[in-house]
Amino acid sequence: MAPDDNIPIACVLSALTPEQREREGVLLREHMASVQEVREHDDGFTFRYVADPALFVRMAELVALEHRCCPFLTLQLEWSRGQQAVPWLNITGGARIKEFVRSTFTPTPR
């Protein structure tokens, strides 16, 4: 068993101030509204956004807040090189947390 397999699957509610928690909610709603594509993996999900620098910065803020309150998640926001590249957010953590990621970060079909 890897050392990280022992990280509890529990949000650390005290990790964020009330203002940060409110901001997290705003950013999470924006994430849900902005996702263009979802890819499912064995250990989590990947979400594609439009190529908008301002959105990328806000999603980086969401990643920072989620990392503080959900240390059991692996969060990776990337925007590869090239004119046609778009940002992707990869949220993983193993099979144990996949349903949490699905229910928390995956938008319902429109």
What does each of the following model-derived ranges do?
Residues 60-82:
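Amphipathic, hydrophobic secondary-structure cores in small proteins
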Residues 1-57, 76-110:
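Secretory/periplasmic and organellar redox-cofactor proteins
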